[in-house]
Amino acid sequence: MHCGPPDMVCETKIVAAEDHEALPGAKKDALLAAAGAMWPPLPAAPGPAAAPPAPPPAPVAQPHGGAGGAGPPGGRGVCIREFRAAEQEAARRIFYDGIMERIPNTAFRGLRQHPRAQLLYALLAALCFAVSRSLLLTCLVPAALLGLRYYYSRKVIRAYLECALHTDMADIEQYYMKPPGSCFWVAVLDGNVVGIVAARAHEEDNTVELLRMSVDSRFRGKGIAKALGRKVLEFAVVHNYSAVVLGTTAVKVAAHKLYESLGFRHMGASDHYVLPGMTLSLAERLFFQVRYHRYRLQLREE
């Protein structure tokens, strides 16, 4: 089985925090205090009582993270930084779990995206009734078809995972951190990796591809995926690429809304996409279908 680096992207949200400069008033107060310490205090002149000194200003809260980090509201302590070799297994686990979640979505919810498959299944149920004249047997046909969809979705997606885990995800540092134009980032919370994303350059058209975005299911809804996506956009801008592209077979609407919120435009979809690891057997064609969506964010015109 030939396994090329796959293009499926995992879905799921934080805004990149920026370091705050020190308040200029603080420096001024420090200079005044130093000057006052050089001279002895003068005796108080007679007159009305002086007003009590103003209370010191409250300390300014500093954002979490730092250079390369992110700490928005709802994502306390989360930082986005480059991948380290010791985090290989944690990154692979998050990627694996995120892809395995696709199985029921592809088998059941994804059926709504394929009217031809729906029509075929309806014809099979009608044929069963015409042959058997059994209403009970006919009612079992949809359940059997959905069971077959789940079986083949699991089979194909697991084969896809095997390809991915033995290609780019087998050695993240070698595949993403060493080649120019590529990088891999992790989202870290309390010392634990909770999200991943990768970028890979295509020099022929001066674009960067967003890949492997996934967030641990226990930490979703905190803006981590959006922060990871923005890190890829920042990488593309810094390295002077003209656009960022991505492809996804995600079924959930939330994933597509995330890409649009980052500024991506939907460029089209294909119903005949072949995942790495597929055998293209007749059974797979009948019971496994995915729609591949293409997105693009233009950063500058060539």
UniProtKB/Swiss-Prot annotation:
GO CC term (a single one): mitochondrion
Primary location recorded for the protein, binned into one broad class: cytoplasm
Location in or out of the cell: Cytoplasm; Microsome membrane; Mitochondrion membrane; Endoplasmic reticulum membrane
Transmembrane segments: 121-141
Activity regulation information from UniProt: Aminooxyacetic acid (AOAA) blocks its activity in both cytoplasm and mitochondria.
Induction or repression: By methamphetamine in brain, via dopamine receptor activation (at protein level).
SUPFAM superfamilies: Acyl-CoA N-acyltransferases (Nat)
Record's catalysed reaction(s): L-aspartate + acetyl-CoA = N-acetyl-L-aspartate + CoA + H(+)
Record flagged with keyword Acyltransferase: yes
Region (Disordered): 46-72
Comp. bias regions, Pro residues: 46-60
Tissues where the protein occurs: Expressed in brain.
Xref: InterPro entries: Acyl_CoA_acyltransferase, GNAT_dom, NAT_camello-type
Residues of the N-acetyltransferase domain: 143-283
Membrane topology note: Single-pass membrane protein
One of the record's GO molecular function terms: L-aspartate N-acetyltransferase activity
Keywords assigned: Acyltransferase, Cytoplasm, Endoplasmic reticulum, Membrane, Microsome, Mitochondrion, Transferase, Transmembrane, Transmembrane helix
PROSITE patterns noted in UniProt: GNAT (PS51186)
Alphabetical GO biological process terms: aspartate family amino acid metabolic process
Keyword Iron: no
Role noted for this protein: Catalyzes the synthesis of N-acetylaspartate acid (NAA) from L-aspartate and acetyl-CoA. Promotes dopamine uptake by regulating TNF-alpha expression. Attenuates methamphetamine-induced inhibition of dopamine uptake.
Similarity comment: family membership: Belongs to the NAT8 family.
PANTHER family per the UniProt record, alphabetical: GNAT FAMILY N-ACETYLTRANSFERASE (PTHR13947), N-ACETYLASPARTATE SYNTHETASE (PTHR13947:SF11)
The protein, known as: N-acetylaspartate synthetase
Species for this entry: Homo sapiens (Human)
